[in-house]
C-alpha cells in the first residue's frame, strides 16, 4: 500500500503555480495591446466585471496595491484622513503608499478580524467644522480580509456602511483583491 501525501500551501495566493491546463490557456489566448484597448481578453474581463457590479465601466490594474493606491488618490486630497481597520492591507502591506502617494493619514479602527462596523466608522469621523483635525474623506474596507484570516463582511453591514458614507459625504473603497473568495 502506498500513501500519497499532498502538501497544500495556503499562506498566500501568490505561491500557487499554474496547472498545465492554465498554461495551455495562456499560450493559446488571443492577445493585443491593452494600452490601445486592443486586448480582447482584458476588454472582455473589464466588461464582465462592470456588468457584474452594475457599473458603466471597469479598469483592470496589474496589482491590487496599484488599484488601492489609485482609488485613494482619486477619493482624497493631501491632508485628508481615511478610516480603515488596523489590519488593513492598505496600511500594513503597501509600503506607506497612503501617505507617500496621497499625503493622507489613516485612522485605524480595531475591528473584528479586519472588519469594521458602521457604528465604529460613525464614531471615527472627524467633525467637519473642527479645523485642527484632518478632514475624513474616505472609508476603506477589505473583503475578504487578509490579515484577518479571510473573514467575510456581512452584506447588510456593507450596505449600512455605504449608507453612512453617503449621508456624511464620504467616499467608500472596497479592496476586493480576494473578493471572489467572499
Language-model features: locations:
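Conserved N-terminal alpha-helix of the aminotransferase class I/II PLP-enzyme fold
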Residues: 19-64, 86-87, 91-92, 97
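Conserved core of the PLP fold type I
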Residues: 56-75, 109-110
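PLP-dependent aminotransferase-class I/II
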Residues: 102-163
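N-terminal amphipathic/basic leader segments beginning at the initiator methionine
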Residues: 6-25
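Buried hydrophobic positions in well-ordered alpha/beta secondary-structure cores of metabolic enzymes
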Residues: 10, 49, 67, 98, ...
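Catalytic PLP-binding core of fold-type I/II PLP enzymes
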Residues: 151-182
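Hydrophobic beta-strand scaffold residues
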Residues: 82, 105-106, 172-174
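Conserved PLP-anchoring active-site segment centered on the Schiff-base-forming lysine
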Residues: 74-92
Amino acid at each position: 500500500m502506498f500513501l500519497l501525501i499532498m502538501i497544500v500551501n495556503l499562506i498566500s495566493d501568490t505561491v500557487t503555480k499554474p496547472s498545465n491546463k492554465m498554461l495551455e490557456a495562456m499560450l493559446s489566448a488571443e492577445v493585443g495591446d491593452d494600452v490601445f484597448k486592443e486586448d480582447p481578453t482584458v476588454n472582455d474581463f473589464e466588461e464582465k466585471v462592470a456588468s457584474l457590479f452594475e457599473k458603466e465601466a471597469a479598469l483592470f490594474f496589474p496589482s491590487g496595491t496599484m488599484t488601492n493606491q489609485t482609488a485613494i488618490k482619486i477619493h482624497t486630497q493631501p491632508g485628508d484622513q481615511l478610516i480603515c481597520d488596523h489590519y488593513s492591507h492598505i496600511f500594513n502591506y503597501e509600503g506607506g503608499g497612503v501617505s507617500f502617494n496621497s499625503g493622507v493619514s489613516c485612522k485605524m479602527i480595531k475591528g473584528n478580524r479586519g472588519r469594521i462596523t458602521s457604528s465604529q466608522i460613525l464614531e471615527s469621523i472627524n467633525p467637519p467644522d473642527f479645523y485642527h483635525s484632518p478632514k475624513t474623506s474616505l472609508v476603506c474596507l477589505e473583503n475578504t480580509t487578509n490579515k484577518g484570516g479571510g473573514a467575510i463582511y456581512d452584506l447588510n453591514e456593507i450596505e449600512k456602511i455605504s449608507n453612512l458614507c453617503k449621508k456624511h459625504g464620504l467616499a467608500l473603497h472596497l479592496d476586493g483583491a480576494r473578493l471572489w473568495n467572499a
